[in-house]
Amino acid sequence: MFFGIDLTSTPAKLSACLGLDKELHIAYLGFLAADRDIIDVINLCLPEVIAIDAPLTLPEGLCCLEESCPCQPKSEWKNRQCDRELRKEGIPCYPTTKKTFIKDLIYRGIELENELCQQGHHVIEIYPYAS
């Protein structure tokens, strides 16, 4: 099974979740709020791969996205390498800098990925707009 999550920046808004079996038939479709609910459904479905539509890493050199923190990106371009590669191809993407407006989404995605990986799940970051 494959499991996809269109994650929202806050549990106050529902995240769309979809599980596909190996024949690509819908095995699960739902809208979930809390990360715990998402994790519980994933643990019932036991997918081979979990795809999350949210940035799951920070730019190299950053430990956080807080402007008050002295951490700095290693590159003068500030965004992640994958974001720069997309932009080179003319594909826009949300910034992953300290001034980003999707800070909550990034933090939530990273926390969810960490929890799922600790449980032994295979998690990947996806960006459907780019495909």
Regions found by a protein language model. Give the residues of each.
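Phosphate- and other anionic-substrate recognition elements at nucleic-acid/protein interfaces
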Residues: M1-S131
